[in-house]
Amino acid sequence: RKSYRIPFTAIPLTRNGTIGFQVENAMAATATGWALGLDWSVIEKALAGFINDASTAPGRFNVFDYKGATLIADYGHNPDAMQALVQAVDGMKSIRRSVVISGAGDRRDDDIRQQTEILGQAFDDAILYQDACQRGREDGEVVALLREGLKHAKRTKRIDEITGEFKAIDLALERLQPGDLCLILIDQVEEALAHITRRIAETA
């Protein structure tokens, strides 16, 4: 039986195999193509062309460079997503890590807390923001739950609370130094990505 191999270096989506959930996505796509009887060269070409940016997959681990720092924008809003994001970030070099996060008000209290419990083990700074739609929660309620989740954080030492998604993003960008990494968990996907793109353009 023939066997075929494609190195992760040939699949940009996986960032050389360091992004676990993208490796899984690539494997699933490969299996689907193979099951459909596609020629291996077609599958290989498709994997090489997978692009995961703000225009093709908005809010899905979009990576940017900002003054020599790495920005990641993602629409993750649950503990499983946080775990996957932390695993991905662990495979990326950085001097200091920061995270910008809000929470969906229609989630359970424990689910909101668990997000920052996970992030608190992996990031040095956390900026908590109240997003545009509280989804039935009182003002400040979601941010308070996020802060509770950081109560026993092993790594996060600096915590800020901000009202407004763009203000939170701007604060994070102001603090970034070359070699840092910032994970921005966006709420208003298109608007937030446009804001980040504008801020990056201002540095050009």
Where do the language-model regions lie?
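Conserved phosphate-binding catalytic cores of ATP/NTP-utilizing and phosphoryl-transfer enzymes
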Residues: 22
